[in-house]
Amino acid sequence: MKTFFHIILSPLRWLAQLLGLLRTLLVNLILIFFLAALFMLTFSNDKVTVRDNTVLVLTLSGQIVEEQKIADPLTGALNSLGRISRLADETLLQDVVDGIRAGAADPRISCLLLDLKDLDQAGLDQLQIIARELLKFRSSGKKVIAAEDYYRQHSYYLAAHADEVYLNPMGLVDLHGFGIYRLHFKEALERLGVNYHIFRVGDYKSAVEPFSRDSVSDQTREQNRTLVHDLWQLYTDDISRERGLQPRTLELYTNHVVAQLAAAGGDPATLAWQTGLIDGLKTRQEISEYLITLSSPDTEQDFSQISLADYLRSDSIPYPEKKRKDSIAIIIAEGPILGGYQPSGAIGADSIGEQIKKARLDPDVKGLVLRINSGGGSAFASELIRQELLTFKKSGKPLVVSMGSVAASGGYWIATPADEIWAAPATLTGSIGIFAAIPTFEESLARLGVYNDGVGSTALSGSTDLTRPINPQLAQALQLTLERGYRRFLEVVAAGRGLEMSQVSQAAEGRVFTAAQARDLGLVDKIGHLDEAVAAAASRAGLTDYSVQTITRSDSMVNSILEMLRENGARMLISQSGWARLQEILSPFKQSLTGLALFDDPQRLYARSELILESR
């Protein structure tokens, strides 16, 4: 018998020893990892020296964001060190602004070179902010030069604001217009046996259409056509002004490309030059030789240059700005609105609530600018944030909202308490409406021969079980709650904006508006960017001499170390075009399905707008 048990237990003992060995190895690897991180933290912050007559290379990579995500710092750090990710997943907008401004005032910087080949995504509002800084840089008497193998839409917008724009002789300028396209899953869900129960208020509330339709509704099509037309007009007007083009030039270039290309002998680069989109055709070597004439040669074959990342670590950047006794605080609200504490890249009701409270209790903070770039999310979380902002206002400090590319639905809900709302020229806002969505999988399971049955103590027992058909009483209760939530949304807007309910109703039903339309409807006060909103807050606070500080969320030291590793590792990477292409292909699926993971509202009510503008 002992021999029998020995035979049975021996593999288990061996397995336990193996697990213990693996656990010890893992602990040691983590220890080495953190020691390396501490070493990098200690020695990687040395100031970079800038040589005289140096070209500042403004490299924009990944997505332009206003708050960098640290949602999974360990993965980010390992990806960067393992050369899995791109050169950088994100570029912080404020870093770009700081770098350009410092370069304009730095006598050692001779000119600025735009490096846009790895720029994946940016809102038109963000592009406009960077473009304004480029124009200010040019006004200092220094050149801005753009030179690429090819230009996509968002990268060309910035290039058009340069003094000189060059293109590789084998390149092209890809301008094709804006669009709003979404995948629709109704037929797929039916084939899978998934029953999606949709509840919504507002004919224009289109966030759930992909799960209930196979095509865009007439109302949504009408609305989106107006939005893309107005934003494209804004885009083309800016480019035509900076490039000195006739208004019809870009219309011919995009809508009659076949005839235009045929006239240019089928050569896209020649077409771009003949149209006036670029100033000349130059190879990479010719660009390098040209830049040597504008700077000190670093070697016989290259020019003296410094990257934006290194320049931000140099002694030229007065960053962060020294806090004065009187300051205007900025809080970034970017991403989906969710309950609880959320990492950077999402707006958590509790996490941003702490930031607002910090601004309220700080005696040196005399005013607050809430920078919103969000399509909304949980209605309950949005209301919690609004309540915290109302508490802030009781302190007597002014509250100003600055809207980014999108401030819609729940993003507009949290803007309503503001004393003053500024929307950027390219802002999309409104979408006053709410919805609820509950999928059930009883048919999916039945096809597999799996059924759910039993008894409950009340009529609502088991009503939240997604493997059962939706309870009729739950559906009716949810619709009543939804209608009450919609009325509450209208009341919040009316109270915050000083409008009659009839006026709000005309701007509701889930409609989305451009900044100009929203201003005409009384939903926003003025059109301008973040700088103007900060100045407005200072004016309301009676300040003329003040500093600006950004109140960030409190991250743990572990997260900070891991994020530092990610940033330092990213600088060692080369662009992974294959990986980037895969991400681009999967992007529509990610954008369409991400919303499913964000449904965390306790009442299942969502004030969210799915505005995905295809602008690349």
Label for each model-derived stretch:
Residues 1-87, 94-97, 169-170, 179-269, ...:
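Intrinsically disordered, low-complexity segments enriched in small/flexible residues
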Residues 51, 161-163, 192, 276, ...:
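Short, structured coil segments at secondary-structure junctions
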Residues 54-182, 319-444:
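Cleft-lining beta-strand/loop regions that shape enzyme active-site pockets
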Residues 143-144, 275-278, 521-524:
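Short active-site oxyanion
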Residues 150, 256-267, 406-408, 510-511:
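Short helix-initiation/N-cap motifs at beta->coil->alpha
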Residues 166-167, 278-284, 423, 524-530:
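Short acidic-hydrophobic, aromatic-tinged amphipathic segments that line or gate anion-handling sites
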Residues 343-598, 605, 612-616:
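C-terminal structured domain segments across diverse proteins
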